[in-house]
Amino acid sequence: MSFEAEVAAALRASIAPATPIDFDDWALRVFAHQFEHVPAFRSFCERRGVTPSTIARWDDVPAVPARVFRSVDLACGSPEAVFRTSGTTGGPEARGRHAIPLLDLYRASAIPTFERFLLPDGVSLPCLFLLPPPALRPESSLVHMCGWVGEAFGTSVEWLAGSTGLDVARLTTRLAELEATGEAVLLAGPTAGFVRLFDNGTRVRLGPGSRLMDTGGQKGLDRPISRAGFLRACWTHLGIPTYYCVNEYGMTELCSQRYDSVLRDRFDGRSLAPRRLVGPSWLRTRILDPDTLDPVGPGATGLLCHHDLANAGSVSVVLTEDLGRTIADDGIEILGRVAGAIPRGCGQLLTELAQS
């Protein structure tokens, strides 16, 4: 059994509440594995005086800026799949590249987390994805995940986008058909896709229990939309209550995701809990000062730094340029991205990696 397969087994075992994952132990084991198998990461750590023998806690593991995935090979072995970020600025060479040695490790993280936050009632539903099918987007981690979701939880699966984008007319027709039957449905896709549907004037009342997952991307929109405005539009145009609208926060550079806690909280009898992005036990997020990379105080704004054990096949600690803050004791809120120049802390890490 490969090391990545061991981690996948540990993640699956920790889904049961009685067997929480030992995050510290696994974080150190994952770091030792990556230190041994990713030469660029090992050189970077050695320049900082960090080795498996010099650290004692999970938060001692050095972070790698997400930008590094654009230019450095960070895989622990031959990849079973390679996912790429969707950004096109600067050409294909500027897109992030995440090589995955074991797809089952990504699945072991993604599928139970999706089920926990989107399907807390244990239902199976028709799945309408506002995305191209895997054959058209094999390098999309989101498309890959949705394919697994359809296999695991879908009574049927339809992909409503193609090489020219979202097929709004076809989607509108399918929604009208579902409205007529009263059957509940799962909709999933980028926020921008839903906004295009709303701007088309589509108005239906989908069956009780219908739900929606949006991924937060607004690229290509003529106008920005607030979260509150988006939730209102979901009710106005689809008849989906706000507590059945679940935002997903994910990155190509991570194998784990966070989800809006609203639906899970409702089924757990916590309807008054604040909306926040919550992840699995094997994903931890620190909020760091953009200049010093020191942790900020509770509720203060800083850069999101994710420690994802499901990233065992590449690098587990990824420093983003997303700004956020902690909410309650288990969640975060995204407040946007750093504007303008790269944050000083990120820039220093990028310089060190370039010298490694």
Give, region by region, the residue ranges found by the protein language model.
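Anionic, Ser/Thr-rich low-complexity intrinsically disordered regions
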Residues: M1-F23, A56-D59, V64-V72
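Active-site glycine/GP-rich loop and adjacent strand/helix microenvironment
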Residues: M1-L11, I21-H33, P39-A40, S124-P126, ...
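Active-site diphosphate/adenylate-binding microenvironment
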Residues: H33-R84, P92-A99, P112-D121
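Short secondary-structure boundary/capping elements
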Residues: G77, Y106-S109, L166
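Hydrophobic alpha-helical segments that mediate membrane insertion or helix-helix packing
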Residues: R84-T89, D260
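Gly/Ser/Thr-rich beta-alpha loop segments that engage phosphate groups in nucleotides
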Residues: T89-P92, T252
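Long, hydrophobic, well-ordered secondary-structure blocks that form the structural core
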Residues: G96-E139, V143-L160
